[in-house]
């Protein structure tokens, strides 16, 4: 058996919200909105072109670039909630000059899933404002959280205020190892299987391809169509 540890399925708010969804807290999940929008500094017009970061994690030769480094955890989480991806459309904005300043880069994607569910995802910078947060909307209620560690908020139509629900203190790595051991004993597959990791990274590559070609990328059985297994994105380290 192989498990890919690059996942936060068992971490804090990700794990707790998945438990609540499985227990029917919001009915059937149908829509998600995920923001990884960190606070950006004021960018001078000189930043309109060229690399915006020289950190190795932004270099596609070493890490895959901005998309997997920015929110592969959230992409995996969305798949754990909604199921297999059937298509994705992605575009990037920013680095436009407005007088003496330039707008920060932002990646935006719309993902469709096998049951007809949809999620919108944004990653990038907002000047002076930390715009992080995840919302999962269902047929009878919604869940939201802003930090990986929780708490999770349950929103019901008959409640004036959301219910705050704390997250377990159980170490995520212990839960991940427990899941792997269970899979080994039962002959099944762990949640963070090698195939799951391949699908996560395939989604990242499909987002790059969508931006490059300006079109929606379709999937078959959770794998993007028309992208070779050994294809590597070699575009700008920072999204342009």
Where are these regions (language model features)?
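Predominantly a Rossmann-like dinucleotide-binding segment in NAD(P)-dependent oxidoreductases
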Residues: 1-3, 8-100, 214
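Glycine- and charged-residue-rich phosphate/anionic-cofactor binding loop of Rossmann-like
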Residues: 4, 160-165, 183-200
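Glycine-/small-residue-rich active-site loops that bind phosphorylated ligands and cofactors
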Residues: 9, 128, 199
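Contiguous beta-strand/loop segments that form the cofactor/metal-binding neighborhood of enzyme cores
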Residues: 31, 69-151, 174-190, 204-208, ...
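Amphipathic C-terminal alpha-helical segment
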Residues: 42, 203-213
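A short glycine-threonine-serine/GTX helix/turn-capping micro-motif
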Residues: 62-68, 162-171
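Short, mixed charged/polar active-site loops
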Residues: 118, 142, 160-163, 216
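Hydrophobic, well-ordered secondary-structure elements that form the walls
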Residues: 180, 197, 214
